[in-house]
Every structure is written in C-alpha cells, then in structure tokens.
Amino acid sequence: STNRGRARVAYDDYPTPAWCVRRLVEAVDLPGGRWVEPCAGRGSIINAVEHRVDWTAIEIRPECREPLELLTPQAYIEDFRRTSLGTDYDVCITNPPYNLAMEAVLWGTRAARVTVMLLRLNFLGSAKRADFMTHVAPDVYVLPNRPSFTGKGTDSIEYAWFVWQRETLLRRRGKIQVLAATPRS
C-alpha cells in the first residue's frame, strides 16, 4: 500500500503521476466538452490531461484553491458529496481517497456520461462492492508499472483506471486491458 505502515496522509493527498494519465488518454477515446475532477487536490490530473476541455475542479481543502484557480476558473472548495454543482458533465475523472472511492464512483456515474477512476486493482474484489460490480461492470485499464504517489518509490500494489460509460452502465461484463508499460527513465 501507499503508507507501508506509516501514518495516513491527510485527505489521502497522493498526487497522480502524469504518466498514469497519459497511459489512460492513449488507450481510451474520451470525449471533449465539460470535465469534472471531484477530488482535484492541487490539480495533477487536470495538469496532465492535454485535451482542451472545460474543467470544473472540486476539492475539499482550502489550501488547494490557489493552484486550482491557476488551472481553471471553475474551482470550488467543497465536498463533492455535498456539492450543488450540476450533473451535466461529459467526463468525471479522479483519483479519489480510497475510503471515498465507492462514493466517488456513484457520484461520477450520476454526474457524467463517462466516469474514470484511478483505483487499486483490488477494488474489483470486495464483497461489499460485488453486487454493484456485477451489475454495473466497468472497463478496466491496468497500469503495468506501479505508480509512486509519494516520490519515494513505488507502491506494493497494482492500480488501474476504471471506466464506466452511461450508455453501457447496466451491464454484467466489462473489458480488461493491460496498458503499455512506461519506460523507466
């Protein structure tokens, strides 16, 4: 895990490495338009997406306002679970705090046509999520390189991008694909 026995980082503030986002956009044809990042942090995903899209950033921590406002004028400091913002987005993309992952998935599938979450691969295996995952199956894009969210070496677990599309939401099977490896520099 990211912590490896250490104290948990406040708000699970683990910025998403840009290469993780690049692997996603190389593999998945995401629509343009209005995108929302409901757990935006300081905007690492927004920074990494090279699409020209209209961003809305939502983040609970006030200290993230300034960096987010440099990326989008639509930066809101609030809890995505309690936001009064609309739900007419083309894409919802985030690397949510793991303890809020299911809530983020549910919020995203209501808020956007396409919902994209960077999650531990073992998100597939929970008994608590089994009913949801067997009736609302995502497409799963596995990152073959383990990301480092701390800059101090890689995690000990695998990660994947989980993608739900509103038009295929109620299905029992999704696809799984291992993405291209990122060369070590």
At which residue positions do the language-model features occur?
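Class I S-adenosyl-L-methionine-dependent methyltransferase catalytic core
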Residues: S1-S185
